[in-house]
Amino acid sequence: MIILITGASHTGKTLLAQRMLEEYKYPYLSIDHLKMGLIRSGQTTLTPEDDDALTEYLWPIVREMIKTAIENQQNLIVEGCYIPSDWRKDFDQQYLQSIHFICLAMTDEYIDTHFDEIRRHASAIETRLHDTDFTPESLKADNHYYIDSFTRIGEQVTLIETASEDSICELLKIERIKWMEQRFNNALAAIKDESAASLKAIKEDVAELSKYYGSELWKLDFAADEAGNLPPDLKRGVLSEDGIWNLLSDYREIQKKKQ
């Protein structure tokens, strides 16, 4: 499974990737690190300020790394700014079903309220904006770009509206449910198909679903759902006890028949 994280500067992409690494034990690739390695080694004449050109240069490399990881059934978190809004066109469905996408952006209200805090935590190496240009207006423009370009093409953008650390913790919970829901749907489709290739493709999905269902995390997410504390538009069939129990039971029965 690939977790692809993008968004505006200072939205917590690296922090989210780190939290996911800690929770899922997946390694992660920083596109910024790849960028600086190529620039410092003289492999390109581009500079860190050449945002659009860097996206055109870096994305073909990153997308093929993603395909290779999927083909090798490896897990990877990929994080960075240089992901085009139409990234899906570069992957067939067999790849897309193994990619979980997250885009982060801050609201104007959040920027107005927390600008000084954002500026204090800004990294001189990672920022896409010069210090002299780092104003509330420039930061809003950067976030508007991600909100507009990604929503225009049909992608969901997660808006940061509360204190960053709290937002990241809440986001991690929501993305965990979305991610498991994606695995749940992959497994449902494969079990319905019953072909050997389909069942082989969901082996990891079923293993992760089984681990999730038997963990305290599932109980916490289930309790949050029962209490009405999850977004109403969040699809969460994976939090149906009958649904996930039946799925895992059906998978085991099919595997027994094929032995």
PLM regions with names:
Residues 11:
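ATP-binding Walker
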